[in-house]
């Protein structure tokens, strides 16, 4: 969602604030702004649109000051125009905010009755006026923050600077993440480690309910009970700095091409590739005591768990429930002690998924999280973490994090099967060898990049696309449809191939192509029958299959993307790549913003 940066420095901070905001662009935004304190006075510049517009304004109106805050806004309350951009200011303070204040209408009404006027449609302005009211009553800055905080319902992370105070910044967290960076006589606050990595190499993460007072003399963090607390200081790993596109046109293109390498790192963590065995997770989880797995996730991460369901059921004979996190958290389902709850999230900050994790913990259920950000809130709160090791992912549409989630889940399923006695030593060697081949095969698929771009030229003028898949290819079809609509803004829907005749076939005509994900596996013949139904109605088919599948298909109405022949087990990981390339090239041909699609955020930290 929104991105926050705050700097209490030794020199003019405006350019550094912009640099920090650029590192937060991947989160998605529609406006931006910065505010500084110079000689006790507050100054602010904001702009609608991309950061380049803010930079142009700053050239005309430079901001001085060694204390400042910055923000990239993703609209929730109020349209994406400059007046709604952060920071918001009053005569006493400037504030940036990530989150949603659920009772802002009630608070706004109260403040209006007291004579306060509102210039924006945002919920953030309510916080600004609440703190200002408290300051006018004679409270200190710290007391004003604490008093106002008690009135707020919802999720928020805020950073505040004050008129007349060149050496004070206060940050508070109730939900969305905040990190503090420690420099030499200067300090930083940011939404995540990526924002701070170019300034410092030591950070601490604020816990839920924390608030912090920053001066050039040091940082004091207070817990929810308002008592000083010590939070562990983490040294940033080198990969946090790797946010350059290199020779690639877009971050997404770079991240797709990084998949062979990052999956190699992932597999080395979970597999003994010298002996072709799974590294045991027994010190974390005793699979013999587990009778059911509960997955709760959102978006692309949810689709990874749909694939995993097949693996855990087939290999480990475990019952699996898959839930969309935003639905699960409001159902209050009964959960027993023999359940392992698993939460998948690239950022580890997804609000709905985090709420599900907390629900399961409160009910005494063992919790595991599969995340890409190992210092995230979910990683800290779960009983144990399975890192995906994908490295920083900047493109809003997930690519390498998704395939690393699949690889992690595949290794996890093999370990469960091995512990439960349903996986022979021979089968273990066989499946681990198959996983070890994934990086090499992905490199082969990447050689089809140019061919896939040519096929995508036929998609730029369509009015919609259907994706079909069966078995483990069904979740990949769902992910393909999601990727295409995220990036190209073409309406796309994914369906289980067997559901075609139960409604979607009514949409089939020459203007709506059907993309079929169908390796030559045990489901291929049935999927081929569905393809023939499409062809009989003059539908246009794009078939993603392997050499054997292409030989069998032989339909005149299709374009074919032919992948190497591969085992059924690893097919979902391999077939994820061509559906990513289809979405990417279609979006590029249409001229959309591939790395930052409209209305989307990388880290969804509010409901």
Swiss-Prot record:
GO terms for biological process: carbohydrate metabolic process; fructose 6-phosphate metabolic process; protein N-linked glycosylation; UDP-N-acetylglucosamine metabolic process. Its EC number is 2.6.1.16. It comes from the Bacteria. It is an enzyme of class 2 (transferase). The keyword Zinc does not apply. Residues 277-422, 455-597 form the SIS domain. The keyword Repeat applies. Its main location: cytoplasm. Residues 2-217 form the Glutamine amidotransferase type-2 domain. GO terms for cellular component: cytosol. Catalyzes the first step in hexosamine metabolism, converting fructose-6P into glucosamine-6P using glutamine as a nitrogen source. This is Glutamine--fructose-6-phosphate aminotransferase [isomerizing]. It comes from Bartonella quintana (strain Toulouse) (Rochalimaea quintana).
């Amino acid at each position: 969602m929104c991105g926050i940066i705050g700097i209490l420095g030794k020199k003019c901070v405006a350019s550094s604030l912009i640099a920090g905001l650029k590192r937060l662009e991947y989160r998605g935004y529609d406006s931006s702004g910065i505010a500084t304190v110079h000689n006790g006075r507050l100054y602010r510049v904001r702009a609608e649109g991309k950061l380049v517009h803010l930079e142009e304004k700053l050239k005309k109106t430079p901001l001085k000051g060694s204390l400042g805050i910055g923000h990239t806004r993703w609209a929730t309350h109020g349209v994406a125009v400059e007046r709604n951009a952060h920071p918001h200011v009053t005569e006493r303070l400037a504030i940036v905010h990530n989150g949603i204040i659920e009772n802002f209408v009630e608070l706004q009404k109260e403040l209006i009755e007291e004579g306060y006027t509102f210039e924006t449609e945002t919920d953030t302005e309510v916080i600004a006026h609440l703190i200002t009211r408290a300051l006018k009553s004679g409270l200190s800055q710290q007391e004003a923050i604490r008093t106002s905080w008690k009135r707020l319902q919802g999720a928020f992370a805020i950073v505040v600077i004050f008129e007349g105070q060149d050496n004070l910044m206060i940050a508070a967290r109730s939900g969305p993440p905040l990190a503090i960076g420690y420099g030499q006589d200067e300090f930083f606050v940011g939404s995540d480690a990526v924002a701070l990595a170019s300034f410092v190499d030591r950070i601490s993460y604020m816990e839920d309910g924390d608030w912090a007072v920053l001066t050039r003399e040091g940082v004091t963090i207070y817990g929810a009970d308002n008592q000083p607390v010590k939070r562990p200081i983490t040294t940033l790993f080198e990969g946090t700095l790797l946010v350059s596109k290199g020779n690639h046109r877009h971050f997404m293109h770079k991240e797709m091409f990084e998949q062979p390498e990052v999956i190699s790192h992932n597999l080395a963590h979970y597999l003994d590739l010298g002996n072709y065995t799974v590294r045991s997770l027994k010190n974390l989880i005793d699979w013999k005591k587990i009778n059911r797995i509960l997955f709760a996730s959102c978006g692309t991460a949810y689709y990874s768990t749909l694939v995993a369901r097949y693996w855990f059921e087939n290999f480990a004979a475990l019952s699996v429930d898959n839930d969309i996190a935003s639905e699960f958290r409001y159902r209050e389902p009964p959960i027993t002690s023999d359940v392992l709850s698993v939460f998948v999230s690239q950022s580890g900050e997804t609000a709905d998924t985090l709420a599900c994790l907390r629900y399961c913990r409160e009910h005494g259920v063992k919790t595991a999280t599969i995340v890409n950000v190992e210092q995230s809130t979910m990683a800290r709160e779960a009983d144990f973490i399975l890192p995906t090791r994908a490295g920083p992912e900047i493109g809003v549409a997930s690519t390498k994090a998704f395939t690393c989630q699949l690889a992690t889940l595949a290794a996890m399923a093999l370990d469960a099967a091995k512990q439960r006695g349903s996986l022979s030593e021979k089968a273990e060697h066989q499946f681990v060898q198959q996983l070890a081949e994934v990086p090499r095969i992905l490199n082969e698929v990447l050689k089809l990049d140019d061919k896939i771009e040519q096929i995508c030229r036929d998609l730029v003028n369509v009015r919609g696309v259907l994706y079909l898949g069966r078995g483990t290819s069904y979740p990949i079809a769902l992910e393909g449809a999601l990727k295409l609509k995220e990036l190209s803004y073409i309406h796309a829907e994914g369906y289980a191939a067997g559901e075609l005749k139960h409604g979607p076939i009514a949409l089939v005509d020459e203007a709506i192509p059907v993309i079929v994900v169908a390796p030559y596996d045990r489901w291929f013949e049935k999927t081929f029958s569905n393809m023939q139904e499409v062809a009989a109605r003059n539908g246009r088919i794009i078939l993603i299959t392997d050499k054997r599948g292409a030989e069998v298909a032989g339909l005149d109405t299709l374009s074919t993307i032919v992948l190497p022949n591969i085992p059924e087990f690893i097919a979902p990981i391999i077939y994820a790549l061509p559906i990513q390339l289809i979405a990417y090239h279609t979006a590029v041909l249409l001229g959309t913003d591939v790395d930052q699609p409209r209305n989307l955020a990388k880290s969804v930290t509010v409901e």
